[in-house]
Amino acid sequence: DQASLLDEMPAKVASRLLQGLPYSQRRVTSGLLGYPAESAGRLMVPTPTVLTPDTTREEALEKLQSRAKRYAAGPHHSIALATVAVTDESRKLLGMLELADLVTAPEGTLVGELLGEEQHSVSAYDDQEHAARLIQEADLLALPVVDDEDRILGVITVDDAMEVLEAEVTEDAYRAGGAEPLNEPYLTATVMTLAKKRGVWLIVLILAAFLTINVMQYFEDVLEAVVVLSIFVPMLIGTGGNAGSQAASSVVRALAVNEVRPRDVLRVIGREVRVGFLLGVFLGTVIFPILAFLYYPQVAFTISLTIVAICTWACIVGGVLPLVAKKLGVDPAVFSTPVVSTLVDATGLIIYFSIAGVIMADQIRQATGG
């Protein structure tokens, strides 16, 4: 907690406060600050309870009782009591035990006999989110952090892991909406801060929207020849944007929980092609009779076929962009709703007018005198 607090302060202030700490605390805090930001090393509690395999159950409980009295007022009191690291004489990690394992063990049982086969650990240089996800997936109270030789350095507690996951969810939610995450509560942030956090992406998106305008200008002759086509532009680009955003959200979430990786791009494309095609066929089938009744079959067929093509394309774009972002080291959440929608808007119009140009070619030629 001291390391986290100092990390958020200006360098000069943090340095003065660090020098004011007792030597033992200063040494521990300096060690934590030596690890990269967002690393597991920055998040760990560097004073875990450590036992050797030949420690008896009674000796272990006695040590935990003594430690509980020493850290009764500490922020990680409950975790210090609930988890124990088992190491050899060189502090090489052998496994972790929970208090329940010791309490329920028969008298005289050695700690080493209680270790299970499945054990988890992370490097001090691993990403904090990776460590937090591991704690969540394995349902751990604490996750050991080790060095290159598997010697224990500390533990990451479940409460700290949940804070990391909450922060990641908040960050993804902001970026999915096209805004930078806030570093302070919403009601305490100034209006200028809120505007700055949102304005950057709005500028990017409004510049990207010029692609859509250029496409409309390029196909101006088609629109003038068949004016009815312009009526369906909002519906088509809206459908494509929504389909792409849904695909992006699914893949971003899958990346966050390590269900997919950038190398799975072909598998993702294969799945999204099928999903997009099925969605397009379903939507096209629903609207075809309505459009045929209100307008005429050529228009109905053009719009229905365009929806199939746009939904398929939008799902591919929405599925692939987060994988590309991850490969480039960019937060995949950036390529969620706003970016995908803007890109699909422009490319969707190209698909629409290209299909219309083929199906309604005779009508366009007659209208233009070609």
Regions found by a protein language model. Name each.
Residues D1-I231:
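Cytosolic regulatory modules rich in charged/polar residues
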Residues Q25, Y71, V122, E259, ...:
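A short hydrophobic/aromatic micro-motif that marks alpha-helical segments and, especially, helix-coil
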Residues G74, S121-E129, G270-R271, T342-I350:
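Short, highly charged low-complexity linear segments
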Residues R27-S30, G34, N242-S245, C315:
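Alpha-helix N-cap/helix-start motif at coil-to-helix transitions, marked by capping-box chemistry
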Residues V169-W313, V320-L343, I351, I355-G370:
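Alpha-helical transmembrane segments and their membrane-interface boundaries
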